From Swiss-Prot:
It comes from the Bacteria. Cu cation Z2 binds at residues 136, 185. The keyword Oxidoreductase applies. This is Nitrous-oxide reductase. One of its GO terms (molecular function) is nitrous-oxide reductase activity.
């Protein structure tokens, strides 16, 4: 290890040796209290002293949307800020009973059309779709460094997928599975000139192809970095790298993306993965990679151009940092990038303006580092305000550390200056944190959310499984002040705070919307108009049932099919009243789906049980809601 590196980091052994007791205390929720020192505990009373309040009175609206991931629940949750009220859930990788996501033909098309061939085959006897997902890192699309209100992208760590959500209707319209890659952990989107690319980190290293021919030959294992075209939702290119990729971000100039990396040792056990004093971040030169694709400097693997970006490649640069960095976050000043140490008490600050010289071999990799302040134990993620300050979560300490970037740079040059402004106890063990508009050039410095992994004693006891704790912090003044605790179900890994002026959802579906275009096309082929049709069409043993719905009645009060028919029911909500969603459920047939105003939804099932089966509107849409029903008559097979 060089003298330059030695003086700019605390070794892994020092960290683990000095923090064993604190780590145990942190796991019990006491870490912040034990390390009080310069820390403070600030409560909601601060709001009464002139700070901001989370109160949103009845009839008033929140100023921000917050898009929360849900981890292993597989959905996106929309929360209002500052009230922290949950407004809506968007099913994505999960099966959702309320809306019929995963059951309706429209949702199943989204869930299946982007599957890889081998997984399509794998799922044939498993219902054709994955029933689980692990949704991390929801991030909206950009134009010129700020949100443009078009899309939200997120990743599925469990099944190596990426989704796109339309922000006009708040529904997922595309899901793709990434070839060659094993898991997607970090995901960020191109900020400039627009999105553009969706950058996806492949965390685990596996053989390519992963067909069982190299099970234990770890030299054949590789990690993959993927760029997805956010407009077409197709893989644009991939880069093979050394080590395991963790989190990713990109610059405000459209030139570079960069990922944290752990397991530079390329081991397969915890001890092997932690044996080195250092890992690295990988910087990707987007222009050079695009030129490589254009010039054919790649190997095609599973239909995708894969570029060699391992050590020595002209397409990447590896910058050493302390062991096992986790989050990487670009500051809204467009200059600085912070990699968070996790196993080191430090964060590493890079100046993106130095990356040009780095790729031209005019400077050494560590010359791109401009600060490396020691903040506390377990730094994971960093957010920003509009005053040049950064806010880093300290997992083991159970704290948020507020520090100043320019002072950290001065200290790195040897000046006697402390960049730390404040440490705030949070409850407990924070992971991600996010500031209002803080991932854009329009950061406003008002609010910070700390996504804490444990709630412990903050809420009524609900049994062994307890909620997470999302704490809202006022950062508009000189001191951070906690103003709200919000419980959340498993398990938010990330969130993005977007000002409401950036998003303009509709209240009605357009009849020209592509989401239900297949239903429109089928009705047209049957000579019908979905806005008027209340008919049954038989095609052999396939039966298509068309009906309208207008509260409080379905257009068909009964329909008859034969046992073992394949039945597709199309329901079109012809109401033109805002917030008048209908449902369609068939008793004892496992069928339920949402039908929003002016939308069509469809479901296909086998009528395997003869008898009388009532269907009803599962959404309370009218005073005569209970009477909005009809009969499905299933004639038994003839002997």
């Amino acid at each position: 290890m060089t003298e330059e590196t030695r003086k700019s980091q605390l070794s892994r052994r020092q960290l683990l040796g000095t923090s064993a007791f604190v780590a145990a205390a942190g796991a019990s929720g006491l870490g912040g209290a034990l390390l009080a020192g310069s820390s403070e505990t600030a409560l909601a009373a601060g709001a009464a002293k002139g700070g901001m309040s989370p109160e949103v009175k009845p009839g008033e609206l929140d100023e921000y949307y917050v898009f929360f991931s849900s981890g292993q629940c597989g959905e996106v949750r929309i929360v209002g800020l500052p009230s922290m009220r949950e407004l809506m859930r968007i099913p994505v990788f999960n099966r959702d009973s309320a809306t019929g996501w995963g059951l309706t033909n429209e949702s199943r098309k989204v869930l299946t059309e982007g599957l890889l061939p081998q997984d399509r085959e794998f799922l044939k006897d498993r219902g054709d779709i994955f029933l689980n997902g692990d949704l991390h890192h929801p991030h909206p699309s950009f134009t010129d460094g700020t949100y443009d209100g078009r899309y939200l992208y997120a990743n599925d760590k469990a099944n190596t997928r990426v989704c796109r959500i339309r922000l006009d209707v708040m529904k997922c319209d595309k899901i793709i599975q990434l070839p060659n890659q094993h898991t997607v952990h970090g995901l960020r989107v191109q900020k400039y000139p627009k999105t553009g690319y969706v950058f996806c980190n492949g965390e685990d290293r596996v053989p390519i192809p992963n067909d069982g021919s190299h099970l234990n030959d770890v030299k054949q294992y590789h990690a993959i970095f993927t760029a997805v075209d956010g407009e077409t939702m197709k893989v644009a290119w991939q880069v093979m790298v050394d080590g395991n990729l963790d989190n990713v971000d990109c610059d405000y100039q459209g030139k570079y993306a960069f990922s944290t990396c752990y397991n530079s040792e390329e081991g397969t056990t915890l001890a092997e993965m932690m044996s080195s004093e250092q890992d690295w971040i990988v910087v990707f030169n987007l222009k050079r990679i695009e030129e490589a694709v254009a010039n054919g400097d790649f190997k095609e693997m599973n239909g995708v151009p894969v570029i060699d970006g391992r050590h020595g490649s002209k397409y990447t640069r590896y910058i050493p940092v302390p062991n096992s960095p986790h989050g990487i976050n670009t500051a809204p000043d467009g200059i600085h990038v912070v990699a968070n140490g996790k196993l080191s008490p430090t964060v590493t600050v890079f100046d993106v303006r130095k990356f040009d010289d780095l790729f031209d071999d005019k400077i050494k990799p560590r010359d791109a580092v401009v600060a490396e302040p020691e903040l506390g134990l377990g730094p994971l993620h960093t957010a920003y305000d509009d005053k040049g300050n950064a806010y880093t979560t300290l997992f083991i300490d159970s704290q948020i550390c507020k520090w100043n970037i320019e002072d950290a740079k001065r200290a790195f040059k040897g000046e006697k200056v402390d960049p730390i402004r404040q440490k705030l106890d949070v409850h407990y063990q924070p992971g991600h944190n996010h500031s209002s508009m803080g991932q854009t050039k329009e950061v406003d410095g008002k609010w910070l959310i700390s996504l804490n992994k444990f709630s412990k004693d903050r809420y009524l006891n609900v049994g062994p499984l307890k909620p997470e704790n999302d704490q809202l912090i006022d950062i508009s003044g000189d001191k951070m002040v906690i103003v709200h605790d919000g419980p959340s179900f498993a398990e938010p890994h990330d969130a993005t705070i977007v000002h409401r002026s950036k998003i303009n959802p509709v209240s009605f579906w357009s009849r020209e919307d592509p989401f239900f275009a297949d239903a429109v096309a089928q009705a047209k082929a049957d000579g019908l108009d979905l806005m008027e049709a209340n008919e049954v069409v038989r095609d052999g043993n396939k039966v298509r049932v068309y009906m309208t719905s207008s509260a409080p009645a379905f257009g068909l009060t009964e329909f008859t099919v034969q046992q073992d028919d394949e039945v597709t029911v199309y329901v079109t909500n012809i109401d033109e009243i805002e917030d008048l969603t209908h449902g369609f459920a068939i008793v004892n047939y496992g069928v339920n789906m949402e039908v929003a105003p002016q939308a069509t939804a469809s479901v296909t099932f086998k009528a395997s049980k003869p008898g009388v089966w009532w269907y009803y509107c599962s959404w309370f849409c009218h005073a005569m809601h209970m009477e909005m029903q009809g009969r499905m008559l299933v004639e038994p097979k003839k002997a």
